[in-house]
């Protein structure tokens, strides 16, 4: 098990997160002031009255204290930062949480972003803070904050760097030192900074923290399929070219290799959320939600690294199956 960060590391992460949070909030204060001035100067600003009502889940009896309203019904407000699993064309986890469970979601997720980019000075947290303002303006607070990241730190054009050539006896396959550096150091450090930064932002701006949900990935099959098949200017494939580069051509072998590295990623997250200072963070294990069996994996996976949408797109609703795992956790929150 990789060691948890020491006190000095934790202190430096907290200091960096606090500074980043203060810089973001200073930009938000400037934006709020400009918006307030614009509305003051507006000849007829539109006033919108919203009524927040506790809405029971389908089939449940409404509590005695619930008011009756059709003004602003929602299962709750969510904030999200992340990668393509939160920002995929037409369907993704967030659209399923919206459509299937009734959440209102403010997202700063951007497909293709590595986790270390998300938390950088040019990352997603400024837009995250703007989304938080929008929720607060409605008189609400976030039910939870969702974080999806790390896949783009592993997959992509540099993926082959993680693999030793098949002929490099006695160490063909995953280069453990490189894997440790990428997953257990770079990605884990970026996750720590992301979580501490989000907590710092919320504490400084709203006086409290909120539940944070992170997730691992499921087991993919590196079959060479990109977005809409890939090729040309279309994104992908993300995995098979790296295996081809290192002369691994047996899809059964490479599928098992992906199981190994996905397990490594999930173990990192499982350990990370148990570190001191993260009592508000929950990890969701998505492994074995979708299939990686050669018999039916294409029913569940649209391409190498993204689930199927089902319906008119064919196959199973992989996004829906994953969103159901999120809902199982969200349903336990107040």
Describe each model-derived feature in a short phrase.
Residues 27-113:
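Serine-esterase "nucleophile elbow" of acetyl-processing enzymes
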Residues 119-140, 188-200, 263-264, 268:
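A Trp-anchored, charged/polar loop motif used as the substrate-binding/catalytic surface
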Residues 169-192, 251-258:
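Surface-exposed cleft-lining segments at the edges of enzyme active sites
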Residues 187-239:
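Hydrophobic, aromatic-enriched interface-forming segments
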Residues 223-282:
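Substrate-gating cap/lid alpha-helix
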């Amino acid at each position: 098990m990789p060691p948890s960060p020491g006190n000095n590391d934790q202190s430096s992460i907290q200091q960096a997160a606090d500074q980043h949070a203060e810089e973001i909030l200073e930009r938000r204060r400037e934006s709020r002031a400009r918006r307030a001035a614009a509305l003051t100067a507006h000849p007829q600003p539109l006033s919108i009255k919203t009524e927040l009502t506790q809405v029971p889940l389908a089939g449940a009896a409404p509590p005695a204290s619930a008011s009756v309203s059709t003004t602003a019904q929602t299962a709750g407000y969510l904030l999200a930062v992340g990668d393509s699993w939160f920002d995929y064309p037409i369907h993704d986890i967030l659209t399923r949480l919206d459509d299937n469970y009734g959440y209102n979601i403010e997202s700063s997720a951007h497909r293709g972003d590595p986790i270390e980019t998300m938390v950088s000075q040019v990352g997603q947290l400024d837009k995250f803070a703007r989304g938080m303002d929008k929720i607060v303006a409605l008189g609400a607070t976030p039910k939870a904050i969702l974080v999806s990241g790390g896949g783009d730190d592993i997959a992509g054009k540099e993926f082959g760097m993680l693999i030793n050539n098949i002929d490099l006896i006695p160490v063909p396959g995953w280069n453990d030192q490189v894997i440790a550096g990428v997953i257990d150091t770079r990605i884990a450090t970026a996750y720590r900074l992301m979580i501490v930064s989000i907590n710092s932002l919320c504490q400084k701006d709203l006086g409290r923290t909120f539940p944070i949900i992170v997730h691992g990935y499921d087991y993919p099959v590196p079959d060479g399929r990109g977005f809409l098949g890939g090729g040309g200017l279309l994104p992908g494939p993300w995995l098979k070219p790296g295996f081809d580069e290192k002369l691994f051509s047996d899809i059964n072998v490479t599928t098992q290799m992906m199981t190994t590295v996905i397990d490594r990623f999930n173990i990192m997250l499982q350990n990370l959320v148990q570190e001191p200072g993260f009592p508000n963070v929950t990890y969701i294990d998505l492994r074995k939600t979708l299939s990686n069996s050669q018999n039916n994996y294409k029913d569940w996976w649209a391409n190498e690294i993204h689930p199927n949408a089902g319906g008119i797109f064919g196959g199973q609703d992989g996004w829906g199956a994953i969103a159901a795992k999120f809902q199982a956790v969200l349903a336990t929150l107040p």
